[in-house]
């Protein structure tokens, strides 16, 4: 559940009510292990395109524009999958600031890095078509945040359980990379195995 950061700006008074409690079973974001597989729920990038469309910084057809704007204003939260995480996740975080930035937070202060495979990162059919038609840079589009999907790592032996959880909940769960040993070794690869860079690492908090 989100605590703060849920309202960027508004011309109306807004109140948020939250409740807090204690749990003996918590999945921390900094417990990833070397050789863990990296997974993410849902699709990435739609919300960012919605934001770009609202500021007229993206060339999108009107009917597609409505789709992306809707994803920005009303993200589909994968709440049903969260109750299964304890069965397989070693670490977990929500993708709010951007895939690469949030993944970096998961391995912060650990002697770990990540390998990401661009072609494995899930996007919607509409975004996929837009990337092909306009020759857009996929890794930059999916790195800007506001996706609110679940990013987690798990032992390779948990693959079958994860697949079952995806089928049970109806929520797409995709393996997108791997945790590797050693600091400062994080890499992103395209479909040909060539190393690529992301211009945008995500949203940077200024406080």
Language-model segments: residues:
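Helix-biased detector of long, well-ordered alpha-helical tracts
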Residues: 1-207
């Amino acid at each position: 559940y989100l605590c703060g950061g849920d309202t960027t700006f508004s011309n109306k008074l807004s109140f948020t009510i939250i409740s807090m409690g204690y749990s003996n079973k918590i999945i921390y974001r900094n417990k990833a292990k070397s050789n863990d597989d990296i997974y993410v729920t849902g699709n990435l990038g739609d919300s960012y395109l919605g934001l770009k469309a609202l500021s007229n910084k993206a060339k999108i057809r009107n009917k597609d524009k409505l789709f992306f704007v809707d994803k920005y204003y009303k993200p589909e939260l994968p709440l049903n999958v969260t109750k299964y995480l304890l069965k397989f996740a070693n670490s977990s975080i929500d993708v709010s600031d951007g895939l690469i930035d949030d993944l970096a937070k998961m391995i912060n202060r650990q002697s770990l890095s990540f390998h990401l495979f661009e072609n494995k990162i899930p996007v919607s059919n509409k975004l996929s078509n837009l990337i092909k038609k306009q020759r857009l840079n996929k890794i930059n589009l999916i790195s800007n945040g506001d996706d609110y999907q679940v990013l987690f790592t798990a032992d390779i032996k948990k693959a079958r359980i994860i697949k079952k959880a995806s089928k049970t909940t109806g929520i797409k769960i995709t393996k997108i990379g791997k945790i590797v040993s050693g600091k400062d070794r994080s890499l992103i690869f395209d479909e040909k195995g060539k190393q690529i860079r992301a211009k945008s690492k995500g949203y940077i908090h200024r406080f």
